[in-house]
Design a protein with these regions (language model features):
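N-terminal intrinsically disordered, cationic/polar leader segments
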Residues: 2-76
Length: 76
């Protein structure tokens, strides 16, 4: 049971990359949202996602799912 509680309370940044999807957990804010570029702040750095037809499919308090033809991911 402790492991489940640790997961629920976890505040570390996590990114999971799928084909044409990126799931980002424990982000701070969405800075730029355009069809070809999305920038997300994760406290100490930003993630820049570039591609075509980018959309934010799901947004939760601490998680966001980006979909589209992703061509580049940068950590700054």
């Amino acid at each position: 049971m402790k492991k489940i509680l640790d997961y629920i309370k976890d505040t570390k940044f996590k990114i999971t990359i799928f084909e044409n999807k990126i799931d980002i957990a424990n982000y701070k804010e969405i800075i730029i949202f355009e069809e070809n570029k999305i920038v997300i702040n994760c406290n100490t750095f930003n993630i820049s996602i570039k591609g075509n037809n980018l959309i934010i499919n799901k947004v939760y308090d601490n998680e966001v799912l980006v979909e589209g033809n992703i061509t580049n991911i940068e950590f700054r």
